[in-house]
Regions:
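Histidine kinase transmitter module recognition
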Residues: 2, 48-50, 64, 99, ...
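Short, Lys/Arg-enriched, Trp-marked, Pro/Gly-tolerant hinge/linker segments that flank
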Residues: 2-46, 50-51, 60, 78, ...
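Core residues of bacterial helix-turn-helix
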Residues: 10, 65, 114-115, 126
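Terminal helix-turn-helix DNA-binding modules in bacterial transcription factors
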Residues: 41-60, 74-119, 139-140
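Helix-turn-helix
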Residues: 60-67
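Key DNA-contact positions within bacterial/archaeal DNA-binding proteins
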Residues: 70, 120, 135
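Conserved phosphate-binding and hydrolysis motifs of nucleotide-dependent enzymes
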Residues: 81, 115, 127, 131-134
Length: 140
């Protein structure tokens, strides 16, 4: 029994050495802290996706990720190619467009459902994002 445990331990160490040799040569750093940060960022992103109408703030998102505001902004931008606020805005507007087209909601109702308190602000953001007004979705 002890021989099997020793063999298993040696195999695990050998595999670890191979992984470090392969990835280390390519400049890939195996960093458990970075993995934890990535998991936390994914969790925060999933929470935003799950509750688009919630009035998320950068401070709250950073706190949920266990990062400072500045560090959260930098790491989110690096991980996803856009700021958390830009990401949230785009997801809200995409969801609103789906509500307008598929559920035939009014512009005001769609705006409220995705977290916009003021339909005029929603309409402006929608127009900037898509290049046409939200009311155009109701005509299609």
């Amino acid at each position: 029994m002890a021989g099997n445990a020793t063999q298993l331990l040696l195999s695990a160490h050998a595999a670890e050495i191979v992984v470090h040799a392969l990835f280390g040569e390519r400049g890939i750093v195996l960093d458990p802290a970075a993995d934890l940060q990535r998991v936390r960022l994914q969790s925060v992103k999933a929470r935003m996706d799950a509750d688009l109408a919630y009035p998320w703030s950068i401070d709250e998102l950073a706190r949920n990720a266990g990062l400072s505001r500045r560090s959260f902004n930098q790491k989110f931008q690096m991980a996803y190619g856009e700021s958390a606020i830009d990401y949230l805005r785009a997801r809200r507007l995409d969801a609103a467009r789906d509500l307008l087209i598929h559920q035939r909601l009014s512009v005001t109702e769609a705006a409220f459902r995705v977290g916009y308190a003021h339909p005029a602000n929603f309409a402006t953001a929608f127009r900037r994002h898509f290049g046409y007004s939200p009311s155009r979705c109701q005509r299609t």
